[in-house]
Amino acid sequence: VSANDIKNVQDTWGKLYDQWDAVHASKFYNKLFKDSEDISEAFVKAGTGSGIAMKRQALVFGAILQEFVANLNDPTALTLKIKGLCATHKTRGITNMELFAFALADLVAYMGTTISFTAAQKASWTAVNDVILHQMSSYFATVA
C-alpha cells in the first residue's frame, strides 16, 4: 500500500470516525444489514442482530477499523490486529471471506454517501481493503 493510499484512508476514516459512535455506527450497520441478508443472519444467529447488542458490535467494528487504519504504517502491528480479528471470528465459526469483503465494500459505499470522497480516495480504500482481506484469507487458510 502506498503512502498516498495510507494518507487517503486515514484522512477519510478520520472524518467518519469523529462521528462514528454518535452517528455512523448505527447508520452503517443498518445499511449493512439491509444490503446483505447473509450478514444480517450471521449477526442474528450470534445474538447481536438488533438493539443494544447490534449497537455494541457497530462500535466494536469502528474501534477495530480505527486500529487497522492507525497501524497502516506499521505492517507488523497491522498483521497482529488482523490476526486478532480473525481469531475472534474463527471461534464464532465466521470465516466466510465473502461476508468480510462485502462489509468492507459496503463501508466504502457508505462513506461515499456521507463524506466528501474522491475517486482517488475510493481507490485507496480498495487497495487497503484488499490487503486486509488478503491477510484475513491467509490466516483462515492456515487455521482451517
Curated annotation (Swiss-Prot):
GO terms for molecular function: heme binding; metal ion binding; oxygen binding; oxygen carrier activity. Belongs to the globin family. Heme b binds at H89. Homodimer. It comes from the Eukaryota. It comes from Phreagena soyoae. This is Globin-1. Keywords: Heme, Iron, Metal-binding, Oxygen transport, Transport. The keyword NADP does not apply. InterPro entries: Globin, Globin-like_sf, Globin/Proto, Mb-like_M. Residues 1-141 form the Globin domain. Pfam families: Globin. Gene3D superfamilies: Globins.
